[in-house]
Amino acid sequence: MVNLCDLKKEPQINYPTFWDYKVIFEVHVKASEIFEEILGQREYKFKHSNSSASGKYQSYLLNVYVDSKKDRLDIFDKLKAKAKFVL
């Protein structure tokens, strides 16, 4: 059984670590260019993971080396500014 109090706590993440983001773009967006622009020389890799049934969206799994919580959240914010959705 899960203790509901534990669900409200922030998970403990040991940094530095690799972090996965699911990033969804409209189909005309070149994901590789966006990732390069945001991440530059940082260590990362990505792969196409899915396309929407309508063909309007494409999703990618992005794996990035992050140094801290602030670093992880900064990358999230930058991705969010360029992508349709970021998870």
Curated annotation (Swiss-Prot):
SUPFAM superfamilies: YbeD/HP0495-like. Pfam families: DUF493. To H.pylori HP0495/JHP0447. This is Uncharacterized protein Cj0253. It comes from Campylobacter jejuni subsp. jejuni serotype O:2 (strain ATCC 700819 / NCTC 11168). The lineage of its organism: Bacteria, Pseudomonadati, Campylobacterota, Epsilonproteobacteria, Campylobacterales.
